[in-house]
């Protein structure tokens, strides 16, 4: 199952509009929209299919989708209830995805 679009900007704008979401500044939210930044982040982490990745504040899951392609398991910790719904809808079919929302 391929969940992401052709680029992070398009994906982010689509999800923000679809779910009527704006950044919650009190939670320090911002959204990754630059594919180069995402790709460099994932590459510099040197993630393999043996790795467990813990992602704090996955937001819309733009980085999460890249991590799921590389890691054995991704545990995402999210506090925002609106984001939890989106993450569940996007990644519930991934066997290597776990969402913690406490």
Go through each PLM region and give its residues.
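Catalytic cores of RNA-modifying enzymes
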Residues: 1-102
């Amino acid at each position: 199952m391929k969940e992401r679009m052709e680029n992070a900007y398009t994906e982010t704008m689509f999800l923000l509009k679809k779910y009527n979401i704006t950044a919650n500044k009190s939670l320090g939210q911002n959204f990754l929209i630059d594919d180069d930044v995402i790709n460099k982040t994932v590459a510099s982490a040197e993630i393999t299919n043996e790795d467990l990745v813990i992602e704090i504040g996955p937001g819309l899951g733009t980085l999460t989708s890249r991590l799921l392609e590389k890691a054995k398991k991704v545990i995402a910790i999210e506090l925002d209830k609106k984001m939890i719904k989106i993450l569940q809808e996007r990644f519930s079919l991934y066997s290597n995805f776990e969402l913690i929302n406490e």
